A protein has these predicted regions:
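Basic- and hydrophobic-enriched, low-structure N-terminal and domain-boundary segments
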Residues: 2-177, 397-400, 415
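Glycine-rich phosphate-binding loop of nucleotide-binding enzymes
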Residues: 146-231, 502, 533-535, 543
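Conserved beta-strand position immediately N-terminal to the Walker
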Residues: 174, 368, 443
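Substrate-engagement module of ASCE P-loop NTPases
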Residues: 194-198, 248, 388-394, 424-442, ...
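P-loop NTPase motor domains
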Residues: 211-215, 221-222, 233-430
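Conserved ATP-driven motor cores of ASCE-family P-loop NTPases powering translocation/secretion/packaging/pilus
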Residues: 247, 429-434, 438-514
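Conserved AAA+ ATPase small/helical "lid" subdomain
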Residues: 256-278, 490-521
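Conserved P-loop NTPase motor module
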Residues: 497-609
Length: 609
């Protein structure tokens, strides 16, 4: 008979310790079958109070004693071979387990046990199985000194903290998946809060389609929406600008070619007001993608001049249509953040500093709220922000650590390549594939992993899988988990609130955990719920609703923490206008054939007096 005794004199006896006088058949099981990955244990069910039988339940970890080592297994099935139950005497049961690894005691007396993935000595027939010891369970999830944070407790034993290696979780990207209503947003808020506390140097940009995260991070967050966003049109690449002009519809190749030729001319007019339509070719040549300012009026003027120079009437309808699109977009109140008159000034440093929190002034999180914004605006803006995030991290040489969190990521990176916006997909894919080399990280949150681009999902090295009911979504997660932990995912469709299965680089081994409970005032979307509860039906402001419906909100002054005062009465291109000199002299390597212009200069060169 095997009896676990106290490891040292005076050690307190925990509930897994057994008394030598206890009935072995009520406490222990014996291995009756074993293959390379699984084993079957024969045991007896307790028909008195069920306290011992409760140890043999699905999802529990058990231990098989082999003398010098203890094999750890996860119960994934339990049953009776005869499918009959007797109320008299004891009932023989069979417990199916998946072999996870093995635990061995440390070399020094009193040292912590050590857990190893994989099996070096398999259980023999008749080997004794019992409830895993608390010290062994702690060893299974020990992170071996890696920088870690506590995000909850183990589902099997709430006295044991659930820790993740925060540096590995961030640096190799992570994903949080789960169906609607299981607590994804709350779990993400907890992860972000813990990450900020552990990594004060981290900047976080949240793409928030439901306007809910700002209330969960009030002391860390700066809220940005379409009313307060400053993102001038000249910072958009040609593809991104065309998405706005064509309102998400298929583009006209002839109009795009015209834009590609005329935008550099307008940019040259901004830099050299007296140069006319001449554009010097060479190392200093401007392209449609170069992020330097230009005036919409100059672009429209170039279109008019092009139409006047045409000898054939065939191309005039194309240019006329392009001019109409530009004028329509510039007058659309939904695009006020792009075409605000004062944004003609070169405010790129202030714009980037405010969005990406450089310096952060104690608020390293920017929450970009997108609820109510048209899809073509969301597509273009998300593309610009993702592209800038990567470029900033790249050219900062690792000094700027950025996390881009994508809520409902399947909207930006759908599995179907015909859907979504190609530049956004490309920008996020570049972060997923190369971002960790430069300090730009990706967090993916989705309720439909089956609809997410598998290339993006495959780059996420740590997963937090909450309840998933859809079989296709479950299959995607199963394909990402190690074979030795596949049975853990059998619980995906039945897990409770705040529960998740964590696996990947950020944890020692696959772990079923329960997230910490956040205070009620820090739950995502709390402010909106409180407003809805406090308001009454007769308090509805119909006038305000109609104004929002028409997208003509009252203009509000936008605070730019680092912006200089701009004289809106004088525009770039006016005869008496002089631009402020560039504050930084660019180096000879401003241009990079692979990544484009360095954000430090963005192609700006001081003009000679």
């Amino acid at each position: 008979m095997f009896v676990e005794r106290e490891a040292s004199v005076g050690e307190p006896t925990s509930q897994e310790r057994r008394n030598a006088e206890q009935n072995d058949r009520r406490i222990l099981g014996n291995v009756v079958q074993c293959d390379g990955a699984r084993a079957t244990i024969a045991a007896y069910a307790d028909d008195v109070d069920g306290a011992v039988t409760g140890l043999w339940t699905v999802g529990k970890m058990i231990s098989i004693n082999l003398g010098t080592t203890r094999t750890v297994g996860l119960v994934y099935a339990i049953g009776k071979s005869d499918r009959a139950w007797s109320n008299e005497g004891q009932n023989a049961i069979e417990v199916s387990i998946e072999l996870i690894g093995e635990v061995r005691d440390g070399a020094e007396p009193g040292a912590k046990p050590i857990f190893d993935r994989g099996i070096t000595a398999y259980p023999h027939i008749g080997a004794v199985a019992h409830r895993i010891r608390t010290r062994d369970l702690q060893a299974v999830y020990d992170l071996a000194g890696r920088h870690s944070i506590t995000i909850g407790s183990l589902a099997q034993d709430e006295t044991i903290a659930a820790n993740i290696a925060i540096d590995d979780t961030l640096a190799r990207h992570f994903a949080v998946v789960g169906t609607t209503g299981v607590g994804k947003s709350t779990a993400v808020s907890l992860l972000l809060r813990k990450s900020i506390e552990a990594r004060p140097d981290l900047r976080i940009l949240i793409l928030d389609p439901h306007n809910e995260f700002a209330s969960s991070l009030p002391e860390y967050c700066v809220k940005v929406d379409s009313k307060t966003l400053d993102l001038p049109f000249w910072m958009f690449k040609l593809e991104e600008f065309a998405e706005v002009l064509f309102r998400g519809r298929e583009t006209d190749p002839e109009e795009i070619d015209a834009l590609r030729d005329l935008i550099p001319l307008a940019k040259n007019l901004y830099r050299n007001p007296n140069s006319g339509a001449y554009l010097r070719r060479g190392t200093d040549a401007l392209t449609a993608d170069t992020p330097v300012p230009y005036r919409i009026a100059d672009l429209l003027k170039q279109i008019d001049e092009r139409m006047g120079m045409l000898e054939s009437k065939n191309e005039r309808p194309t240019l006329k249509s392009l001019k109409t699109r530009i004028e329509s977009a510039a007058a659309d109140p939904r695009y006020r953040f792009m075409f605000n008159s004062r944004l003609i000034e070169d405010t790129i440093h202030e714009t980037i500093g405010n969005i990406f929190r450089v310096p952060h002034h104690g608020r390293p999180v920017t929450c970009f709220e997108m609820a109510g914004m048209p899809s073509e605006v969301v597509n273009s803006v998300c593309s610009v922000l993702a592209r800038l995030a990567f470029d900033l991290a790249l050219w900062s040489e690792g000094k700027l650590q950025l996390l881009l969190l994508c809520e409902e990521a399947h909207r930006y990176m759908p599995a179907d390549p015909r859907l979504g916006f190609a530049p956004t997909r490309h920008a996020l894919s570049r972060i997923a594939k190369e971002g960790r080399k430069y300090g730009c990280y990706l967090g993916v949150v989705t309720q439909r992993p089956g609809e997410l681009d598998p290339t993006i999902l495959s780059q996420c090295s740590t997963f937090f899988a909450m309840r998933l009911a859809n079989e296709q979504d479950q299959a995607i997660i199963r394909s990402a988990i190690a074979d030795s932990s596949a049975s853990t995912l059998a619980f995906l469709s039945s897990m409770g609130q705040r529960e998740a299965i964590a696996f990947g680089e950020g944890v020692a081994t696959t772990m079923r955990l329960k997230f910490e409970r956040l205070p009620s005032h820090l739950l995502p979307g709390t402010s909106k719920r409180e407003e809805a509860i406090s308001s009454k039906g007769d308090d509805v402001d119909l006038v305000a609703i109609v104004e929002r419906l028409r997208n003509v909100p009252k203009p509000t002054p936008q605070a730019m923490a680092f912006a200089e005062v701009v004289d809106s009465s004088r525009q770039a291109g006016d005869p008496d206008y002089r631009k402020p000199p560039a504050t930084r002299a660019p180096s000879d390597d401003d241009f990079d054939m692979r990544y484009g212009l360095k954000p430090a200069t963005f192609g700006l060169r001081p003009q000679n007096d």
